[in-house]
From Swiss-Prot:
Family the entry assigns: Belongs to the ATPase delta chain family.
Keyword Ion transport on entry: yes
Gene Ontology annotations for the cellular component aspect, listed alphabetically: plasma membrane; proton-transporting ATP synthase complex
Gene3D superfamilies membership: N-terminal domain of the delta subunit of the F1F0-ATP synthase (1.10.520.20)
Compartments reported by the entry: Cell inner membrane
InterPro entries linked to this entry: ATP_synth_OSCP/delta_N_sf (IPR026015), ATPase_OSCP/d_CS (IPR020781), ATPase_OSCP/dsu (IPR000711)
Protein name in UniProt: ATP synthase subunit delta
Protein source organism: Paramagnetospirillum magneticum (strain ATCC 700264 / AMB-1)
Underlying gene: atpH
Alphabetically ordered keywords of this record: ATP synthesis, Cell inner membrane, Cell membrane, CF(1), Hydrogen ion transport, Ion transport, Membrane, Transport
Task performed by this protein: F(1)F(0) ATP synthase produces ATP from ADP in the presence of a proton or sodium gradient. F-type ATPases consist of two structural domains, F(1) containing the extramembraneous catalytic core and F(0) containing the membrane proton channel, linked together by a central stalk and a peripheral stalk. During catalysis, ATP synthesis in the catalytic domain of F(1) is coupled via a rotary mechanism of the central stalk subunits to proton translocation. This protein is part of the stalk that links CF(0) to CF(1). It either transmits conformational changes from CF(0) to CF(1) or is implicated in proton conduction.
Length: 184
């Protein structure tokens, strides 16, 4: 399935979930569930295989995702949503659904979303300092999502909307390599 189609499907599911969560007053609870699920998907190759598998039956995927949701203590709305996604064979769109839902919530709150990649895990103090600096630079609320990417070797890559600042050691070394090739 082309990525554009998956994006459209993910947006539709995210819109439906957002509207249901809004009408039931559980926007934040569902957002918390989705952030937890996002972290679980990032950390567990087994869970990613279950979600992405075209071989597993709807029933097996439904049972697996239901067990995960129950163990994580997700809300009833999130549990029902995940069950519906499994029955409709749409679990493979979960990453897009989560991103779209969280984007809608941030837009509703007037927040900007920042994605930060770091070579090592940032301490809480470093995350607070980074959030403060981003708030000062972009004005207003900035929701920061920090990911660890050891391939960066050092430094940070910060993306807010369409703006990106890459101060990673990996990029600096690539620029140096290109500059050295030009000398000759």
């Amino acid at each position: 399935m082309p990525s554009e189609t998956i994006g459209v499907i993910a947006d539709r599911y995210a819109t439906a979930l957002f509207e249901l969560a809004d009408s039931s007053g559980s926007l934040d609870q569902v957002a918390g569930d989705l952030k937890t699920l996002q972290a679980m998907l990032r950390e567990s190759a087994d869970l990613r295989r279950v979600v992405d598998s075209p071989v597993l039956s709807r029933n097996d995927q439904g049972k697996a995702i239901s067990a995960v949701a129950k163990a994580a203590g997700f809300s009833e709305l999130t549990n029902k949503f995940l069950g519906l996604a499994a029955q409709n064979r749409r679990l493979h769109t979960l990453s897009g659904v989560i991103a779209s839902y969280l984007g809608r919530l941030a837009a509703r709150r007037g927040e900007k979303s920042a994605t930060v990649a770091s070579a090592v895990a940032l301490s809480p103090a470093q995350q607070d300092a980074l959030t403060t600096a981003l708030k000062a630079a972009f004005g207003g609320n900035v929701a920061v999502d920090v990911k660890v990417d050891p391939s960066l070797l050092g430094g940070l890559v910060v993306q807010v909307g369409s703006r990106m600042v890459d101060s990673s050691l990996k990029t600096k070394l690539q620029h140096l390599k290109l500059a050295m090739k030009g000398v000759g």
